[in-house]
């Protein structure tokens, strides 16, 4: 795992559209974020989809990251966790409607 300072630097580079920085960020954080998502969803197939969506959001939102408000991994885990919770809510809503 990279240091928080390195993660901050990578997120700043991602905000500028640096694909190599994004690949490095992904490689360094995927296992942790996948674990967060898998604990919520308990299904590997759904977790794979959610983690992809989370990284798209991380790519699109990197410019909004503020290291004064949260650590990089906390910010990224929040994005992944919130996306997983959205999926759980959607699944429970659809099962209620059925």
Task: Report each predicted region and the residues it spans.
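Structural recognition of an alpha-helix C-terminal capping motif at a helix-to-coil junction
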Residues: 35, 49-56, 70-82
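Short, charged helix-capping/linker segments at alpha-helix termini
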Residues: 1-2, 15-24, 34-53
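Short, basic/polar amphipathic helix motif occurring as a linker/hinge flanking DNA-binding modules
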Residues: 87-98
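Hydrophobic side chains within well-formed alpha-helices
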Residues: 10, 21-22, 72
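DNA-recognition helix of helix-turn-helix
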Residues: 11, 81, 85, 89
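Sigma70-family region 2
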Residues: 15-16, 39-42, 53-69, 90-92
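Amphipathic, non-transmembrane alpha-helical scaffold segments
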Residues: 26-30, 77
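Acidic, Ser/Thr- and Pro/Gly-rich low-complexity regulatory segments
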Residues: 3-9
